[in-house]
Amino acid sequence: MLPGFSELVSFMVQVYVKAQKSKAYFKRFQVKFKRRREGKTDYRARTRLINQDKNKYNTPKYRLVARFTNKDIVAQIIHASISGDMVLAAAYSHELPCYGLEVGLTNYAAAYCVGLLLARRTLKQLEMDDEYEGNVEATGEDFTVEPAESRRPFRALLDVGLVRTTTGNRVFGVLKGALDGGIDIPHSDKRFAGFNKDSKQLDPEVHRKYIYGGHVAAYMRTLMEDEPEKYQSHFSEYIKRSIEPDNMEAMYKKVHAAIHADPEAKKSEKAPPKEHKRYNLKKLTYEERKAKLIDRLKALNSANDYDEDDD
């Protein structure tokens, strides 16, 4: 037998032996949190976002939560408590038609509007809107609110969830809108649209173009020249409302001005519920059953009296 052959055989046997999970393994197995199993919550990031210094009492740490669906943008100011997360204020992109923006409710420009609306609404609720007006006109440059003499600026931390934080992501559009609205949020300009990784500087003109929907207008012009049929189908809602690439910036400026003027949430007028026809018998109360029985007895007695008169 060759030297070392037995050791080689034993090594190969060890390699191919399947690891058996014992009864103790399954008995002591602990499942992860439900939202971690579903892939909805990054608890490692959440722990760092909500943990407060132990020498601060009854001082919640607020988070700017930005989430995106296929047709909506959700932005909320939230703080954690033992009983669950508490929402201080919220803004949605489906509210933007009230301010003059009826199309493109999920792009970067709409995300900026939602962040701006949330910031102004939160500060108005806390009666800080006059003291912290924020950046009234968006220029694309980085903006950080300066503390006033009386009250410190409202501070929140950006909660992006599980989204991939690439440069120019819409979640940073919400961040930029909230910053211009007057909320103090620790941030860097490296992820704003228009940041050049080669020069390591933010180009304000490119960022401004995204805030005012310039990237959408450029795509509209490209389709109008190259693929008119696709333009008719892709931008049908824009065409229906007579929105052209040249008047895109003016439209967004009006939306920003309307948000600054009145950021309060508007209650939707809902029609009263219709009264449906009832097919089953209504359940009577005790008093109604008693009155019905008395009426039947009176009817029977009157019928008997009528028969006796005939006889």
Outline where the language-model segments fall:
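Ribosome-associated RNA-binding proteins
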Residues: L2-E7, F11-D311
